[in-house]
């Protein structure tokens, strides 16, 4: 997608740490964290895509139970949701919700940002399957995307809520390395920008 910068630093293959090391580091960090929000953030653009992700998810959930950390895990689940991704979300349902991101429901906006959402029927089926397994879900929508209007964004929120989904809304950010950060992209879509303070 034009707003995303995952992998832009190297454009190369990702190397995995050994599974045993990952699990031990999760156990170590969760047993010692002083993070008052008890939030764990996974920096994986497609969590649930690999078979080993089930073991990682199980370790995170077990640590949440044993160490009371994490209470919440922020996860970017694999975009092409399949049975494994649902199993991973089910393993972690005590410490996370499954994001079923849309960004927008407007077809021309999706084209502008080079994104294709899963078909509506597949989205509905996925939502029902998650509900059946006790997995809470939410959808993410981004306001300010190229071609999005106030009316089309509100329409997207209403449509998403009617699908019985919680909605998380974010502003479009320009991230260095993403296509929408380029001067050409800003000029093509007449993007006006402002700076904002990011609390740390």
Where are these regions (language model features)?
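Canonical Radical SAM [4Fe-4S] cluster-binding loop centered on the CxxxCxxC motif
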Residues: 1-20
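Short acidic (Asp/Glu) and glycine-rich catalytic loops that position anionic groups and cofactors
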Residues: 3-6, 36-40, 106-107, 135-136, ...
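Residue-level detector of structured alpha->beta connecting loops
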Residues: 5, 93, 134, 164-165
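Short secondary-structure boundary/capping segments
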Residues: 18, 55-61, 114-118, 152-157, ...
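Conserved SAM/AdoMet-binding glycine-rich loop
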Residues: 23-138, 143-145
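Flexible glycine/acidic-rich beta-alpha junction loops that bind and position SAM and/or redox cofactors
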Residues: 51, 108-114, 146-151, 163-200
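Catalytic cores of alpha/beta
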Residues: 85-89, 146-162
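Conserved catalytic-core segments centered on acid/base and nucleophilic motifs
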Residues: 137, 142-145, 157-161, 167
């Amino acid at each position: 997608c034009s707003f995303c910068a995952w992998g832009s630093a190297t454009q190369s293959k990702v190397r995995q740490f050994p599974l045993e090391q990952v699990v031990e580091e999760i156990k170590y960090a969760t047993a010692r964290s002083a993070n008052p929000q008890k939030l764990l953030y996974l920096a994986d653009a497609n969590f649930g895509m690999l078979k080993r992700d089930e073991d990682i998810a199980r370790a995170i959930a077990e640590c949440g139970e044993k160490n009371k950390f994490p209470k919440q895990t922020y996860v970017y689940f694999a975009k092409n949701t399949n049975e494994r991704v649902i199993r991973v979300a089910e393993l972690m349902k005590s410490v996370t919700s499954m994001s079923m991101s849309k960004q927008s429901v407007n077809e021309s906006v999706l084209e502008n940002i080079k994104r294709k959402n899963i078909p509506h029927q597949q989205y509905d089926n996925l939502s029902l399957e998650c509900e059946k397994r006790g997995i809470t879900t939410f959808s993410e929508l981004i306001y300010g995307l190229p071609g999005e209007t106030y009316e089309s964004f509100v329409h997207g929120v209403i449509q998403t809520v009617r699908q019985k989904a919680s909605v998380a809304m974010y502003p479009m950010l320009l991230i260095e390395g993403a296509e929408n950060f380029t001067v050409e992209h800003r000029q093509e879509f007449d993007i006006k920008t402002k700076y904002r303070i990011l609390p740390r």
